[in-house]
UniProtKB/Swiss-Prot annotation:
Pathway: Cofactor biosynthesis; thiamine diphosphate biosynthesis; 4-methyl-5-(2-phosphoethyl)-thiazole from 5-(2-hydroxyethyl)-4-methylthiazole: step 1/1. The gene is thiM. It comes from Shigella flexneri. It is an enzyme of class 2 (transferase). This is Hydroxyethylthiazole kinase. One of its GO terms (molecular function) is ATP binding.
Length: 262
């Protein structure tokens, strides 16, 4: 199994495209992470929108550049709105991304996520346990936390990618991004990133935005992982713990965009 690396030039090119196109991202995400997700997208140059009412969600999915479905705080009314948005996204050819939070631990969201797979997401982003559960290989995880190493989920990610046509991202100490054939590994980041709620969910929003960019979607999505890890490393070097990490992280994302424009 060959795992390729992403070059700095590829990452910089994707970030230039990101800033140039400034995707409008319809984020149907969980209640815990909305502000952090919106600020992450803004720092990178995208435009976030959090539209959740069923009728509006369907309407907005038709005009957005990309759609994110994150099931972290799933309810039946929210599932109805998400389903309507995904149906409209498919009809309007709006590329959408699934973040199957805790899908291995809870039946309702697992069935819902499996239902959504028939609408062909452009990307799926989860930790190892979530990706393995979604692929039907295991029902693991401890709530939103993984109990598996990212590398162990690569075969499941490849299978899921081939079955759905999605780019699948497995996040961990090393992030792995695959289209079912090629695999890109992204090293970096810092363990402190796991002590801040929302870094993974925010990454899913950036992944969704990258799916709207022209060019190689696999490389664009892998670049999203690279930017987040880069920013995490820079933020950790300047912070004293989780509380001071967040503002430094947002600053680091902003600085990355300034560097590619210089």
């Amino acid at each position: 199994m060959q795992v390729d690396l992403l070059s700095s030039a590829q990452s910089a090119h994707a970030l230039h495209l990101f800033h140039q196109h400034s995707p409008l991202v319809h984020c149907m995400t969980n209640d815990v992470v909305q502000t952090f997700t919106a600020n992450t997208l803004l720092a990178l140059g995208a435009s976030p929108a959090m539209v959740i009412e069923t009728e509006e969600a369907s309407q907005f999915a038709a005009i957005a550049s990309a759609l994110l479905i994150n099931v972290g705080t799933l309810t039946q009314p929210r599932a109805q709105a998400m389903r309507a948005a995904v149906e409209q996204a498919k009809s309007s050819q709006t590329r959408w991304t699934l973040d199957p939070v805790a899908v291995g631990a809870l039946d309702y969201r697992r069935h819902f996520c499996h239902e959504l797979l028939s609408f062909k997401p452009a990307a799926i982003r989860g930790n190892a346990s979530e990706i393995m559960a979604l692929a039907g290989i295991a029902n693991g995880g401890r709530g939103v936390d993984t109990t598996d190493a990212a590398a162990n989920a690569i075969p499941a990610a490849q299978t899921l990618a081939r079955e759905t046509g999605a780019i699948v991202v497995v996040t961990g100490e090393v992030d792995y991004v695959t289209d079912g054939h090629r695999i890109i590994g992204i090293h970096g980041g810092d363990p402190l990133m796991t002590k801040v709620v929302g870094t993974g969910c925010a990454l899913s929003a950036v992944v969704a935005a990258c799916c709207a960019l022209p060019g190689d979607t696999l490389e664009n999505v892998a670049s999203a992982c690279h930017w987040m890890k880069q920013a995490g490393e820079r933020a950790v070097a300047r912070s004293e713990g989780p509380g001071s990490f967040v503002p430094h992280f947002l600053d680091a994302l902003w600085q990355l965009t300034q560097e590619v424009q210089a």
